[in-house]
Amino acid sequence: MAAPFALVSRVSPAARLPIRAAWRRARPTVGLPSSGRARQLAVASAAQENRDNTAVDVHVNQDGGNQQGNAVQRRPRRSSALDGISPFGLVDPMSPMRTMRQMLDTMDRIFDDVALGFPATPRRSLATGEVRMPWDVMEDDKEVRMRFDMPGLSREEVKVMVEDDALVIRGEHKKEEGEGAEGSGDGWWKERSVSSYDMRLALPDECDKSKVRAELKNGVLLVTVPKTEVERKVIDVQVQ
């Protein structure tokens, strides 16, 4: 079968343009699927519920629900600060305090990645304009001081304990808003949200775990862990 352009060359120049245009219109159009096209998922729920779980070794989960009949779009996964992070590279068996600092520094990197969209984002100070991270650890010769931002939680909703060699901080805040009463018709709606915190930090051996102090003030939890004097046994080794 002859090519289309070979047939066009045998006719007059005035007739070539309509024939060529008709051949172009007759060519089939092939559409490649778009990799960035979002898929729609049907979600059916009667109320909205948001749950935020924050941990120091940082597991932040958020489950969102919409009203019945709505559709949500699922976005493609983006690269983030979590890529390439190995938990084995954060542990220093020779220095527990260095391990704690490395974990918190890693969390600072994660919260700097705005693509993650975590609910608990760093706060910006109005006075200095600097970013305030939601936790901090300071250490001197006498004690270890830790700060955790827990906005919206009261003292009754926060529990601090020591399990074996780990400091555990847990909190849960429930909130419910809505209008009308259940069964009153389509106009009834109610919104429930639950925020929970589960933080766990390994304490150094030289800390006095029986004298841990905790204070919650204006949404900021301050934890103080005193240190004990550790007598180091030194043995001189003769060099031959």
Swiss-Prot record:
Tissue: Expressed in roots, stems, leaves, spikelets and embryos.
One cellular-component annotation, GO: chloroplast
Transit peptide location: 1-43
Pfam families: HSP20 (PF00011)
GO biological process: response to heat
Location relative to the cell: Plastid, Chloroplast
Primary site of residence: plastid
Region entry Disordered, spans: 59-84
Swiss-Prot/TrEMBL induction comment: By heat shock.
Stored SUPFAM superfamilies: HSP20-like chaperones
Keywords: Chloroplast, Plastid, Stress response, Transit peptide
sHSP domain residues: 126-240
Plastid keyword on record: yes
Similarity annotation: Belongs to the small heat shock protein (HSP20) family.
Oligomeric and partner information: May form oligomeric structures.
Protein name stated in the entry: 26.7 kDa heat shock protein, chloroplastic
